[in-house]
Amino acid sequence: MPQEEEIMAIKVSENGRLFTLQTKDSSYQMFADDKNVLLHLYYGEKIGEENLSGLIFCTDMGFAGNPEEAGPNRKYSLDALPQEIPGSGVGDFRDDMIEIRHADGSFAADFRFDSFEILDHSYAIPGMPALYDTEEEKGETLVITMTEKASDIVLKLFYGVFEKENVITRAARLENHGETAIELEKMLSFSMDLMYENYEMIYFSGRHAMERTAERIPVQHAKVEIGSTRGTSSHHYNPAVILCEEGAGETHGSCIGACLVYSGNFVAAAQKDQKNQTRFQMGIHPTNFCFHLEKGETFDTPQAILSYSGTGLTKLSQQYHEIIREHICRGAYKHAKRPILINNWEATYFNFNEEKILKIAEQAQKLGIEMLVLDDGWFGKREDDNSGLGDWFVNEKKMNGSMAQLAEKIHKMGMKFGLWFEPEMISEDSDLYRAHPDWAFAIPGRVPNHSRNQLVLDMTREDVREYLLERLTTIVHDAKIDYVKWDMNRSVCDVYSHVAAQSRNGELYHRYVLGVYDLMERFLAACPNLLLEGCSGGGGRYDAGMMYYSPQIWCSDNTDAINRLSIQYGSSFFYPISTVGSHVSVCPNHQTGRVTPFRTRGDVALAGSFGYEMDLNKISEEEKEMVKEQVAAMHEYYELTHEGLYYRLTGLKKQDFMAWEFVAKDQSRALLTIVKTDAEGNMLPVHTKVCGLAEDKLYRCSLDQEVRLGRTWNRAGLTLHQVLGEYESIRVEFTEVK
């Protein structure tokens, strides 16, 4: 490898020891010092390639040990240096990135710089999703090889650069070249030490039916940590966080985002150290994790997507929307127009037959809806949620025939047809469980936990995945199914495989996720024209890993339009609006009992993939006309909402309305939506900012036909001259005047 080498976005200098990764608007710099410690120097606004190691201030901190190479220099300590790969047990007492237990029982991981390689394409991760190259943009990759000081263990650090999107990715691979086995007890996707700023962390917490509530707290010396040990990314915390400077807002301030491309246990943490440096980390959660690596075996972390914005949260979100939409989402529906669907779940729950389903479909077709989705209850002896999971055979008595017959009737109406599955689960009251009780996770000698009265299938087993693949593909092919909703309705515990060696039990949570990814990959390969929508009790697995397989995910089981404002607001910080499964449902709402105007429910659902969750035969004629108008609006604004730039116009502070805006990429039009969330006496007017219009173009506002320059709208905003009652909404369009 030459000492001086560069590809456009990756700059290497100083005899191959200084690495500067350049995107359109940001820079990331590392330096391998004379002791071969890889130091993190900078991540922020775009700079040149000058060596910034002079930013590091070394002093004797006291009780901070010194590596032997430092000699008498007490100022040089791993406990105080800003590192890229902090290891355990060798003098850095902050949270480490990697922990290894060696054959002699010791814990030590001291990795030093060895070499580097540059690739003119993005990197892949075996068995896991990752950003991929397209014809429009290829990533570039820097691979830094680190060797452990006292053992034959190699660590490869992967840095991917997507220049146009201002994205840098991180991942790592551990290779055991030694003669003895090791136990890998922790290995994160990245660690980064940020030297001098004060940060706040924005993270997204919640619970089932109330996911991704945005919260913001300062990063202090007490660690800020979120994560999941539920076997999924979970409803409770999302694997995406933001570090921003104090006071940063939508249009100002420095922001660093981190989004994990993974659907299992994870951790994300930030903490100030004794020098007020902030250590920022993300990866697989170390709880219940232990990977046994024999000689020649390797372990790969999931990918973390990093992005920087120097101009606030809006730009950061738009960068994530673009990278996920273009380099994570795949398949036939990556850009193809998604059908407007109706799902029967809230209309019927388990109480349906062919006649009921056809009546719902007939009315939906008359109103312009394009696909019917048959939810839970069509298979096995599934009359409630206590039985039948795993028996993926059509209940022909309930359905009055085969699924192919029902699908043909739906297709003859000119509609597409979709089905619900929950492949990863099994009911004890099922033929599958009676035949294969060992296929379920259960610890010998213990009664397993039940959730929704179901158990979790051992997705690490090839025979389990083969059975599921055969059942799913057979049904999809036989009935010419157009869409599948893939659900997962419980957390994972009692993890024990009846075929894995006991020494490998610490690998099962991760191997479970790999098994799910493997099944999804093979299923989509067998059904390449299928639209797959992810779901886990709504938004319990709403993450970039799942979006690699399902370009839209049911955002929440909560369909209440007012609650959805918060859920969809939090989702928008990282995930494209095109990934948000959002439906109009009945009122009073089944989750909250709230009554919300039909128009408002439609306006909120338009900020997503859009559909209905009701029996349209039971709504009024006036509401049916509203359905027609909403369907027409979805077609009218589809490209704008699914491909345009998204702006949050209201923020984390409490207000009596919520507003958001879509702007076409060519800035020719914009759609602004306002929902009144609270009513008061002597009502004050609603005034909102407008964003993203071209400064020197003229735009006509649909409210009053007023024409103003884009810069005027952007700065002066918009005042409603009509009073919105509680929960009422309005759509406002801005159109370029040519």
Give the positions of each predicted feature:
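Short Pro-Gly-centered flexible turn/kink motifs
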Residues: 107-113, 291-310, 727-735
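Conserved, mostly hydrophobic/aromatic
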Residues: 25, 172, 296, 342, ...
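Polysaccharide-binding surfaces and accessory modules of carbohydrate-active proteins
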Residues: 12, 17-28, 37-271, 287, ...
